[in-house]
A protein has these predicted regions:
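One-carbon transfer enzymes
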Residues: 1-244
């Protein structure tokens, strides 16, 4: 657990409001130190499920727990006992569920919303605090970094205004979490669709777009779409080594 700076008290009868930020990606920690921990209050950063200990969190009495990017289930006891806020890359109720960025891009979506919502026992179904426009251009890692800075600005507004979240309206559309096998390139219909497929998987911790051919495994990253061609970095390994 990383202890952040202590900012201004925010007028809560002389006490420092306590906030916890959880994030499992390196850019989450970077934005926490660059931006979030400088906001008013006492701040702690958590990056592993072991640190998200119910007893430890309860002893902190946090006003909010913010989840920037989290790959594990949050204990129901923690969600029910504290105001937990997650940031989801869709205009909910559309796009609840897993792999939102990849599911949006593969559907041809170029602009979405970053939604701050209260976590409940039903995934991505809780009431909404804020929505902000989010551009989905660039590679996946660039988009995740962009979204994290946007989330930091939304956190600032939430702790300042303490808005009451409002229930989602409309019919829910559920996204299924993608698997590593689905990163295989299979007959894209156009050069643009191939470019989108490569870039949507190009982030640390994600299985990159690949093809297997003639005993070799080809992984693609850093794609750029030019007129009539794609230029990309390719990492080639022996297929036997990849499978082992």
């Amino acid at each position: 657990m990383s202890r952040g700076r202590v900012g201004k008290a925010g007028g809560l009868k002389g006490q420092w409001p306590h906030y916890v930020v959880a994030g499992c990606m390196p850019w989450n920690r970077r934005v926490f130190h660059e931006v979030i921990e400088k906001l008013p209050g006492r701040w702690d950063f958590i990056e592993s499920p072991e640190e998200l200990n119910v007893k430890t969190i309860q002893s902190m009495h946090p006003r909010y727990i913010f989840f920037l990017h989290w790959s594990w289930k949050v204990p129901d006891k923690l969600v029910s006992a504290h105001e937990c806020v997650c940031f989801h890359m869709t205009d909910v109720p559309y796009g609840r569920g897993g792999s939102p960025l990849q599911n949006l891009i593969v559907r041809g979506v170029r602009h979405s919303k970053l939604t701050a919502l209260r976590m409940t026992s039903d995934i991505d179904s809780g009431p909404v605090y804020l929505k902000r426009n989010l551009c989905l251009e660039g590679c996946a890692e660039e988009i995740y970094i962009r979204a994290t800075y946007l989330a930091a600005a939304m956190i600032e507004q939430i702790i300042r205004d303490q808005p009451k979240p409002t229930a989602q309206k409309g019919k829910g559309v559920i996204f299924r979490r993608r698997t590593g096998r689905e990163s295989k390139i299979v007959r894209p219909k156009s050069l643009g669709m191939l470019y989108d497929f490569i870039r949507m998987l190009d982030a640390e911790g994600y299985p990159r777009a690949f093809i297997d051919h003639s005993g070799f495994h080809f992984e693609f990253s850093r794609a750029a779409l030019h007129e009539g061609e794609i230029r990309a970095d390719v990492t080639i390994t022996c297929l036997e080594k990849t499978k082992s």
